[in-house]
């Protein structure tokens, strides 16, 4: 049986593990520092916005999660004060080296030192944002949809009127999933760009439809 439940503090190591195993570009084999991906895409949500984190757990342990922030601008500001400074002391900014030579680790470290904020027109319409990851054993069984439903309802209860996310343009299965959950495509990069595809959902419309 798979249980969808709220995050607990002792789940943090599992968030790091799942985040690494599901990372684009090779997952666990792509990074020398196994904590880096989680430092950017998982742990800050568990620490700074734990009410916005839910997990899927089966007899083997945690197999997936959804996490995010109800107010993206507030979260970005908190990262700059409460999260990035500590990591910047640990990881050296690679900006003074040739970008073409950067490793997967250095690409993430650069993001720690130079985070880019979400475009204002997206945040104004869809203030919340999310990340969702499932290990293969839980995919295709409806648990991603259950996590999404739980998270979106929680965001609405917290006062949000919309949520957004970004996904790689070549990740067709994820794009199909988000569309099935009610997200609408906001912006698609040119075919030669490495930029992500942005999706958004108006929460009042979605809840009314379900």
Regions found by a protein language model. Name each.
Residues 3-17:
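A short beta-loop-alpha structural element at the N-terminal edge
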Residues 17-32, 44-45, 160:
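Helix-loop element at the rim of GNAT/NAT acetyltransferase active sites that forms part
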Residues 31-53, 59, 67, 115:
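Active-site rim helix/loop that mediates acceptor-substrate recognition in acyltransferases
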Residues 61-64, 173:
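Glycine-rich acetyl-CoA-binding "A-motif" of GNAT/NAT acetyltransferases
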Residues 73, 164-167, 179-199:
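Conserved catalytic-core motifs of GNAT/GCN5-like acyltransferases
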Residues 73-131:
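Conserved acyl-donor/pantetheine-binding loop and adjacent beta-alpha core of acyl/acetyltransferases
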Residues 126-128, 155-168:
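Conserved GNAT acetyl-CoA-binding A-motif
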Residues 131-134, 140-157, 176-180:
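Conserved acetyl-CoA-binding loop-helix of GNAT-fold acetyltransferases
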């Amino acid at each position: 049986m798979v249980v969808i439940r709220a995050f607990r503090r002792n789940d943090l190591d599992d968030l790091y593990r799942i985040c690494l195993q599901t990372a684009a570009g090779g997952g666990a084999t792509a990074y020398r520092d196994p904590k880096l991906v989680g430092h950017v895409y998982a742990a800050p949500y568990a620490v700074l916005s734990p009410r916005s984190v839910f997990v899927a757990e089966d007899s083997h342990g945690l197999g997936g999660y959804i996490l995010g922030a109800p107010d993206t601008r507030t979260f970005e500001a908190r990262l700059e004060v409460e999260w990035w400074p500590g990591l910047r002391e640990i990881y050296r900014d690679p900006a003074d080296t040739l970008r073409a030579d950067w490793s997967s680790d250095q690409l993430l470290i650069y993001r720690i030192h130079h985070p880019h904020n979400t475009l204002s027109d997206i945040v104004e319409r869809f203030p919340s944002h999310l990340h969702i990851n499932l290990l293969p054993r839980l995919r295709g069984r409806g648990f991603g949809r259950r996590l999404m439903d739980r998270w979106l309802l929680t965001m609405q209860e917290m006062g949000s009127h919309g949520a957004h996310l970004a996904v790689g343009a070549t990740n067709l299965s994820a794009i199909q999933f988000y569309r099935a959950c009610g997200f609408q495509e906001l912006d698609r990069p040119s075919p030669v760009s490495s930029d992500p595809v942005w999706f958004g959902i108006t929460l009042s419309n979605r809840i009314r439809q379900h």
